[in-house]
């Protein structure tokens, strides 16, 4: 398959990086620094304006997907519109799916939508995608990440093992998991471990668990984290991300939501649109204000202003003053590990949320769902096994799997199975695989 990515900034670079694992990718960019960085990838680089008709016409033949993710909404929309006009003038060319990154709430009010009538098959809003991701994390109090697969039959959750967790120092075989759950991977510092029974659990490990949703709901007890129950939530910053997230939380009858916003006019505007939340005009770094609002009693503090440094400071203050769990927005991808290194429970990125959404929409043949983990170091991928797949019809022990990839779950009809070496995958089975990013291309070949 062939893909065009317009814009090689934070978002475009990472989309091109991942698409290049399964697609032939062309990157269009006019910034010299971004061009040099994109040139490090296994992609073709074209210098120029991605909305230019001549440039688009030169790359469009045989393109399956065009993704416009520059930092300017109008450029992204015009690029998609122009591509569709060019395709109409060349009916023999392959039909191209167009995807545009759009942030302005005047254009989009949901994370993902379609504007096919103007030439944009899919619009994605990074800020709203991020808000949805945070809301998903809030619905699973002890988890730092969560995704559904196989139409809701399989769930992935990632847990951070705190130093005081009762599992620290124990072996994997000592974890009492139900038969329908499996620990797929452990992230430890910069290492990724495919665990075995005699592996020890260490403080600050991140553990990826896959299983049936019913069993996953009980994992809070297994992992021993004192998970908050979404009751008392303080949201700092009510821009696009904050407001969309506030709307989601505001509908939860069990949530007691307070919002801190420094712009008085925005406070008045938001107060008229939220029914249950308490809106406070102030600065999220004001220690006196935080103390007045009893931050030590907060179950969750979420800092989602448009400024990474302010989010970091707000989060550190909240943590120091006793908040149970802190979530912070980090627009710069290199800040995410830094935030977590200094004690922020969860760092979330609009860029990563957007990459996840684009990858879901550009998945290759046979791929039903996909989620990136730990800053895109690994992926959980759901495939449907076709009759031609190399993985079908023989025991798993006889299949040469690439290093860094394992089959975690198989859904056969309505049965969810943790496969062993003698298990045989059949045509039509849904196969959930954990794979390091370096192993994804090799895994793809097994399903062709």
Swiss-Prot record:
Q: Is this entry keyworded Ubl conjugation? A: no
Q: Which Pfam families match?
A: TrkA_C, TrkA_N
Per UniProt, where does NAD(+) 2 bind? Answer: 232-262
Q: What residues does the RCK N-terminal domain cover?
A: 1-124, 230-348
Q: Which GO terms describe its cellular component?
A: plasma membrane
Q: Which UniProt keywords apply?
A: Ion transport, NAD, Potassium, Potassium transport, Repeat, Transport
Q: Which residues form the RCK C-terminal domain?
A: 144-225, 368-448
Q: Please name the SUPFAM superfamilies in this protein's record.
A: NAD(P)-binding Rossmann-fold domains (SSF51735), TrkA C-terminal domain-like (SSF116726)
- InterPro entries recorded: K_uptake_TrkA (IPR006036), NAD(P)-bd_dom_sf (IPR036291), RCK_C (IPR006037), RCK_C_sf (IPR036721), RCK_N (IPR003148), Trk_Ktr_HKT_K-transport (IPR050721)
Which residues participate in NAD(+) 1 binding? 7-11, 29, 70-71, 101
Q: Which Gene3D superfamilies match?
A: NAD(P)-binding Rossmann-like Domain (3.40.50.720), Regulator of K+ conductance, C-terminal domain (3.30.70.1450)
Q: Which is an annotated GO molecular function term of this record?
A: potassium ion transmembrane transporter activity
Q: Which domain of life is it from?
A: Archaea
PANTHER family cross-referenced by the UniProt entry: POTASSIUM CHANNEL PROTEIN 2-RELATED-RELATED, TRK SYSTEM POTASSIUM UPTAKE PROTEIN TRKA
Which NCBIfam families has this protein been placed in? PRK09496.1-2 (NF007031), PRK09496.1-4 (NF007032), PRK09496.2-1 (NF007034), PRK09496.2-3 (NF007036), PRK09496.3-2 (NF007039), PRK09496.3-4 (NF007041)
Give the protein's biological function. Part of a potassium transport system.
Read off the domain note: The RCK N-terminal domain binds NAD and possibly other effectors. This is expected to cause a conformation change that regulates potassium transport.
Q: What is this protein called?
A: Trk system potassium uptake protein TrkA homolog 2
